[in-house]
Curated annotation (Swiss-Prot):
Residues modified to ADP-ribosylcysteine: C139
Gene (UniProt): GAPDH
Alphabetical list of PANTHER family matching this protein: GLYCERALDEHYDE 3-PHOSPHATE DEHYDROGENASE, GLYCERALDEHYDE-3-PHOSPHATE DEHYDROGENASE
Single biological process term from Gene Ontology: positive regulation of type I interferon production
Assembly and interaction partners: Homotetramer. Interacts with TPPP; the interaction is direct. Interacts (when S-nitrosylated) with SIAH1; leading to nuclear translocation. Interacts with RILPL1/GOSPEL, leading to prevent the interaction between GAPDH and SIAH1 and prevent nuclear translocation. Interacts with CHP1; the interaction increases the binding of CHP1 with microtubules. Associates with microtubules. Interacts with EIF1AD, USP25, PRKCI and WARS1. Interacts with phosphorylated RPL13A; inhibited by oxidatively-modified low-densitity lipoprotein (LDL(ox)). Component of the GAIT complex.
Positions contributing to D-glyceraldehyde 3-phosphate binding: S138, C139, T140, T169, T198, G199, R221
Pathway field: Carbohydrate degradation; glycolysis; pyruvate from D-glyceraldehyde 3-phosphate: step 1/5
Region forming the signal peptide: none
Protein name: Glyceraldehyde-3-phosphate dehydrogenase
Species this protein is from: Ovis aries (Sheep)
Amino acid sequence: IGRLVTRAAFNTGKVDIVAINDPFIDLHYMVYMFQYDSTHGKFHGTVKAENGKLVINGKAITIFQERDPANIKWGDAGAEYVVESTGVFTTMEKAGAHLKGGAKKVIISAPSADAPMFVMGVNHEKYNNTLKIVSNASCTTNCLAPLAKVIHDHFGIVEGLMTTVHAITATQKTVDGPSGKLWRDGRGAAQNIIPASTGAAKAVGKVIPELNGKLTGMAFRVPTPNVSVVDLTCRLEKPAKYDEIKKVVKQASEGPLKGILGYTEDQVVSCDFNSDTHSSTFDAGAGIALNDHFVKLISWYDNEFGYSNRVVDLMVHMASKE
């Protein structure tokens, strides 16, 4: 995610990357890893090592190699906003270590047990600049929440269940091995459909308080490298024809949620969303209604790149509140 947030920053030009911390690889390896990506292709631009710095598109970036976040001299490098993307320091206390080195704000690129969570297009307006440490929630919450918000605002969600058919990620195993958490998480990622837990649906209740306790869900990890899809099956308060649902989602995708929630009526498949920058793209042709109160809604997301673009957007939004 760190590499893709960096790509998103350079692609959009919205934020300036001034420093990167990675204790595990040297500078020349960073050049290689940033330049080549098996999923998203080669970086369209220049990247090289020069005078101990990583130089991307002519911009020199300071490199730190600290294992302890408290030792990173962010302030010296001029870094004000830190993206904590290790997946390890996800609590207020642990992520707060970055502030000791001179950072002003920390954005955790994962769900957090105690940091306030923000989803662009859903509850980002609730951010205020007294908050120093925030979470951008998970990629799945970023897919589900914008859709749930539109549906709830127009028709009311009584209750719902979410399933995400999710691409493999770095936490999984290439072949069977021991897992730190659930046993089946350790089974070979390329060979299996693996039922897994996800806090994404419950987290929607944190970013849309009216939906608290009304949604829960689970995941199936499937052997694809990237792009996932959310299935939201929910009971509606107000009766709605499926065509009405399509209409309001399309309107939202062209209006307040433009760039965050997409809409398509094409016969798409997962690969069509590789490197897509939306948080969520509603698949109008894939959803079904049992009746006017009970519907299954389908939305695609590039779980890597869409999310990384929202991290950048959240940073920009936070900076606008300074």
